[in-house]
């Protein structure tokens, strides 16, 4: 297996222009495909997940052109739901941001489409979304294991009263929200359980509004969506920088700055993960907010005990930053780490122990006490981009770290390690 050894880093300083947000990129691509008119998306993320969405849209007959660097995309909207000529199978890798929204959108009208993906995708639950779509009369068949992809979709979704469990993934609600306006009838979506990752729902609602669709949000408990609507192209749309990707550079600055400035997001960003900067500030770093940047300057870091449900992806970065904080850090309410690219709670606990931390892994929490000195370790990344990026922070100590399968960052940030090296000074 390929590996990358990072030598100790004495200091980080500089500016990072963030790649586009994965969450925003894939939502914007799908809405542009469903919309009337031509949409130009700029600062689109070029990554595996986005390529899976683009390949799926092409297979569904959506016409688009990409710039050479794949960050500018012109899409000719379909002016309504997407249909395949005859039976079709779409392979979506391990891209939850493609699988979930497409599973819903392709239930409109009549289709015969199979959605499948990598082995890990077949372990990521989708039953709550399927149950909800079936309440709206969608015809969906599980082809292997009940409640998991691959799925056969045969259209039929008309709207109506739909319940969805919000406790595992907000992507199920996102998928329903994006599909419901194109259904023939009104849809009332009722949330069962506690809604996780609420800020990701705000991204969805924000984008739907940009594409001309309003819905009624009743305190995140119930959403009322008028049927028979259509999406309208906003013309040009700039994809925000990826706030989860920003977390690694901001944390690096908190630990070994200097000052690092990330551009492409700012105080008015729609992504909940910008709140990560508040957590660093609470730990002792200095944060400065601009309209299109966030900067972080080093501080003495102290441990925290916090509910991280609102920033599940960026919270992983706090788990490795905790290695550099004084005291024991506890991250709570993070059960949904277990249903991501890998079981992130198990993976994080396992790898933190390798570098010498004392770790308590709970059902939905993790408690981390750093060692006096970090051990050298080979870090397994579980084909999970965030594991690779999180553990790069270990190099901010006096100890090198080896990252196995470093190219797995291609899911959201193909040149992550080059960018980190650019702002780093060797010890």
Curated annotation (Swiss-Prot):
Gene3D superfamilies: Enolpyruvate transferase domain. InterPro entries: Enolpyruvate_Tfrase_dom, Enolpyruvate_Tfrase_sf, EPSP_synthase, EPSP_synthase_CS, RNA3'P_cycl/enolpyr_Trfase_a/b. Its EC number is 2.5.1.19. It is found in: Cytoplasm. The keyword NAD does not apply. It catalyses: 3-phosphoshikimate + phosphoenolpyruvate = 5-O-(1-carboxyvinyl)-3-phosphoshikimate + phosphate. Catalyzes the transfer of the enolpyruvyl moiety of phosphoenolpyruvate (PEP) to the 5-hydroxyl of shikimate-3-phosphate (S3P) to produce enolpyruvyl shikimate-3-phosphate and inorganic phosphate. Pfam families: EPSP_synthase. Pathway: Metabolic intermediate biosynthesis; chorismate biosynthesis; chorismate from D-erythrose 4-phosphate and phosphoenolpyruvate: step 6/7. CDD domains: EPT-like. GO terms for cellular component: cytoplasm. NCBIfam families: aroA. Monomer. It is an enzyme of class 2 (transferase). Keywords: Amino-acid biosynthesis, Aromatic amino acid biosynthesis, Cytoplasm, Transferase. GO terms for biological process: amino acid biosynthetic process; aromatic amino acid family biosynthetic process; chorismate biosynthetic process. This is 3-phosphoshikimate 1-carboxyvinyltransferase. Belongs to the EPSP synthase family. The active site is at residue 313.
